[in-house]
Structures are given as structure tokens and as C-alpha cells.
Amino acid sequence: MSYKEKAVKGVSWHLLSYFLAAPIAYLVRVLYANEIPKLDVGLFYAVLDFFSMLVVFRAFGLDQALIRYIPKYLAENRLDMLKSSIVFVGILQTILAFIVAFLVVIFAPYIAEFYINNQGQFTGRLDLVINILIIMAMGYYFLDSIVAFFSNILTGFQLQNYASSTRVVRILSVFIFSLIFIYLFNVHNAYVPSVSYLLMAVVMIIIYGYIVVKKIFPKFAKEKVIFSRKLIRNLFSYGMYVMIGYAGSLILGYLDGICLTYFTGLNAVADYRNVAMPTVNILSYFAFSVGAVLFPMSSELWEKGYKKALSYGVEKVFLYSLIIVTPLAILMAYFPTVIINILFNPKYLSAAPAIQILSFGAMFLTFNSIGFNILNGIGRPNISTKILYIGASFNLIFNILLIPKFGIIGAAITTVFGYFIMWIFQIWFLNKLLEHQFLNKKWILVILVGIFSLIPVMFIKDLIDNVILQLFVCGVVYFGIYILGIFGLKIINIYEVKDIISKIIKR
């Protein structure tokens, strides 16, 4: 199988999983928005953000090092080193996750009183906050570390069909358990998502533990485990850079939720984390799908010295990602209230301005997701780390400055500018390392086509009263004009698109 076919196959699996998981994820959020009090929804996401910030301490970057070294040892046919890497990372990651979870359980009363309830919204109900912290610590945080370990093994072996399926199984399990608790047991509070996430982790450990043991371990079951200094040094030297970088990405991804919890309260967290961010993050699904494939594949291409092939592939990925994300971002920025009314309810209309602002950052988020996977794949996690900390430092400073005064709008503005600053540095390093100029005039043409395609929509919108029909008609008109513009200006080649589609169908 050629690298192009392998890439198309891998991306297709991940896109399919996002296509299946995204509607379910939205159903989960719609369910919570309509069946659980907004304050309890905010509580759950505040606790989830808290544990997400602690994820960096449950593996010290060794999970990502595993993805980096599995294809390397496979290419070198070093099955002994491969098995040793998996065993070492698995043991250490499990121990670290348990220690952190145990410490959170011990200090749960203090975390609940002085952080989660800083605005006094759960005064008199602190027992609920403490219980949610304990459930998420021992359930979601600890057990999910084992799920992540299995998922990273599958990704490292480039078994993209299994790796991508974790996305669907995860959210589907949460959805099913949430339905059971709400409609069968009549539970309507923060226990619903918390316990659902715990049970989801149990289900996934059973399923993917079986797949890993059945599909992968027989290949090197007879190999001895060797804990050599070189192996441990390689894993830690790569993993520590990734860990430091991952800490930066966590600051970028969750610091806004942390600051909103502390400075503005849990209703703002519900707006931002249950509506605004998830809505805009849909736009990055293509980039995440591509990135999951490019990480191990770029590692393999780089190890074999195929720099030109890698550069060509990255250029195409950037262009196609921009073409896909641009129209969706523009429409999302133009119809935020329509989207909220259709998918959620009027209680969450206060999230509309944040959606508009974050939509413009979706393009930079897309590029950054792809670029970081490339940098990590070619063995430059130190560069990723530097860029991430530039963005994280910006976010840290401006979240503290803007959120107390502007709330979720301040969080959204900070996030978008953080993405943009990182993209500037990232594209410069990629141009230098791969000796290729990625930024070109086609990118500008794509954005211009996206903007001008909106003009007819502005006139059509006011002619239709029904919001669903309005969104449908405007979407059809917009995409029709946009596609004509993309092919009319020869930004992409129709024959190449047909070639990609044919490869997807064959798979």
C-alpha cells in the first residue's frame, strides 16, 4: 500500500468516526441542556476541566513517545524493544494516574470549597461537588488513563480503524448511560454525566483491552522484556518534551474554563464548555483526523528520508483543510443564534457571541493541530513545546486580564489570538525544517471565495421565517457558490478530488 493510499485510508476512518461521533456528542449536550439544571452542567464541566489539566501528570509524555517509537521499532524490526516500550509505559502510566487520583480524593473538600465553589453557587450543596470530584478522580481520570494507553498502542501500530472507533464508542457509551440515568432512574443532576463517564471507561477497557491482546500481542508474545537504559532514556527524552508541550496545550484548551469557574461562576462555564467550544470544535474534526494519521506516518517518512514526499503531502493537507473549514467557519459565525435555538435552547443564547469569535479561530486551530503532529512526528517535540508555551503564556496572561471583565467573550478573544500567534511561529519552523514554502496565494483565494459566497446569503436570509428552512436554503446557496468558486479559480484539481474519492470507496 502506497503512503498516499495509507493516508487516505487512515483519514477516512477518522473522518468516519468523527462523522458518527459528532451527532451523538451533540445529542449528549442537548440532553444535558434540557434535562439537567444549567448550574449542574457547569459543575460537571468545571470538574472535567480540572481533571483535564491534570492529564499531563498521568504519563509524563510517555504515551505520545509510544506512538513515536512503535513505528520506529517496527521499521527496524526490533520487536523486543517494541514490547519493552509498551510494558514500561503501561506500568508507569497506571501508577502515576492512581497516585494523582488518590491525592485529588484526599484534597477534594478543599478543591470544592476554594475553587469550584469560589462564587458561592453551591454553598449548602458542597457534598455534591465533593462527590463529583471523587467519582471523576477514581473513575474518569484513573480508568481513562488505561483507555488512553490502549488507544495509543492502536495508533502507533497505525490500526486506524480500531483507533478511530474509540471516539465513537466513548461518546456512545456516555450517551446510553446518560439516557438510562435520566429516563429510567429519573436522575437530573451532575451525577448523570459523572457516573456515565466512569462507566464509559470501564466499557472501553474491556473492549479495547481485548482488541490489543488479540490483535497485537501475539505478534511478539515470545519476545523478552528489556528495560535497558537506552530504551528508558529514549522514551523519557522524547516524552518529557512532549509532556511540557502537552502542558502548554492543556493551558490553551482548559485554562479558559478554569478561569471562568473561578472568576465568573458555573453558568458561564456551561455556556462556554457545553455550547460555544463544542460547536466550534466541530470545525477541527478534519484536522484531528488527519493529524492522527500524519503523526506516525510522518515519523516513518522522516526516518526513511522521504522529505520531499512528506512536504508535498503536508502542503496538500493544509490546502484541503482550509477549503473544508473556511465555509463552515463563516456560516457558523453568521448563524450562531439559529444554531443554538435548533440544537440547544434559549437559556444558552448568551453563548452566541463566543461562537462568532471562536469561529474565526477555527482555521488557525486546524493548521496548528496538523502542524504539531508533523513536528512531533519528525522528532521535533522541542519546537512544538516552545510554540505551545508562547501561546499558553499569552492565554494565561490575557485570560486573567479579560475574563473577570468580559466573561466568555474575553475567553474567546484570548483563545483566537493565541491560535493565531502559534500558527505564525509554526509555519515558519515547518518552512525551515521541510525546506518548503507552505503559505501561498491559494490560501488567500480560498478565504476570499468564502467571504464573497456569503453575499447572496445576506439577502436570502430575511426572506425566510422558519429557522431550519432558513439555515438549509442559505447553506445550499452558500456551498453551491463556494464550490463553483473553488473549482472555477482552479484552487484544487477536480481529477485529484476524484482520485481521493475513488481510494476512499475502494477502502
Curated annotation (Swiss-Prot):
It comes from the Archaea. CDD domains: MATE_Wzx_like. It is a multi-pass membrane protein. It is found in: Cell membrane. Keywords: Cell membrane, Membrane, Transmembrane, Transmembrane helix. The keyword GTP-binding does not apply. It holds the Pfam family Polysacc_synt. The keyword Transmembrane helix applies. Its main location: membrane. The chain crosses the membrane at residues 8-28, 41-61, 86-106, 130-150, 171-191, 193-213, 235-255, 275-295, 323-343, 355-375, 387-407, 408-428, 444-464, 467-487. GO terms for cellular component: plasma membrane. InterPro entries: Poly_Biosynth_Transport, Polysacc_synth. PANTHER family: POLYSACCHARIDE BIOSYNTHESIS PROTEIN, PST FAMILY PREDICTED COLANIC ACID TRANSPORTER. Belongs to the polysaccharide synthase family. This is Uncharacterized membrane protein MJ1068. It comes from Methanocaldococcus jannaschii (strain ATCC 43067 / DSM 2661 / JAL-1 / JCM 10045 / NBRC 100440). The lineage of its organism: Archaea, Methanobacteriati, Methanobacteriota, Methanomada group, Methanococci.
